[in-house]
């Protein structure tokens, strides 16, 4: 975790909790292109996003893409289950092989520090708050937030930007 005296410079300055409650230092993802996304199991966007994320992950994981999924119950109560139930659904139904982290808040006073950083890095058109499930942030190999995508932007439509950051034609 970034110390109180220094402002985080990249996502590598953060530690988050995995689905089992263990600390994960995001610096382990140095050199990877990341999609960081807040997810929900009971949203109208669930099927299309998880299906697309699984496909894009399979296609580019060997070139250095990683998807970091953070369950969030702040939008319509659409992620009410336990982290075990969420992980089971995602891994069974959508064959997700990317990490599912512990449930977080993405807005408000209790927002995860990582999400405060993501939003401050790429606010702009979207404002400072996450609007809905499946808001996506694209992070380069140096841990810089390079783009933010709306919930209705499919991971497949991000492919051109992902390929550019991965350096693949």
From Swiss-Prot:
It catalyses: a hydroperoxy polyunsaturated fatty acid + 2 glutathione = a hydroxy polyunsaturated fatty acid + glutathione disulfide + H2O. Keywords: Cytoplasm, Oxidoreductase, Peroxidase. GO terms for cellular component: cytosol. Induction: By fungal elicitor. The keyword Oxidoreductase applies. GO terms for biological process: response to oxidative stress. This is Probable phospholipid hydroperoxide glutathione peroxidase.
């Amino acid at each position: 975790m970034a110390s109180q005296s220094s402002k985080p410079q990249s996502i590598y300055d953060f530690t988050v909790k995995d689905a089992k409650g263990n600390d994960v230092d995001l610096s382990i993802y140095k050199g990877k292109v990341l999609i960081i996304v807040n997810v929900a199991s009971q949203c109208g966007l669930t099927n299309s996003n998880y299906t697309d994320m699984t496909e894009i992950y399979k296609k580019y994981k060997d070139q250095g893409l990683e998807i970091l999924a953070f369950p969030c119950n702040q939008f319509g109560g659409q992620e009410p289950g336990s982290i075990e139930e969420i992980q089971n659904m995602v891994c069974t139904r959508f064959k997700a092989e990317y990490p599912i982290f512990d449930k977080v808040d993405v807005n408000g006073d209790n927002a995860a520090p990582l999400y405060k950083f993501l939003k401050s890095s790429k606010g702009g058109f979207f404002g400072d708050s996450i609007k809905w499930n499946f808001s996506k942030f694209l992070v380069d190999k140096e841990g810089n937030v390079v783009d933010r995508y709306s919930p209705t932007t499919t991971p497949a439509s991000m492919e051109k930007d992902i390929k550019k950051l991965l350096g693949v034609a």
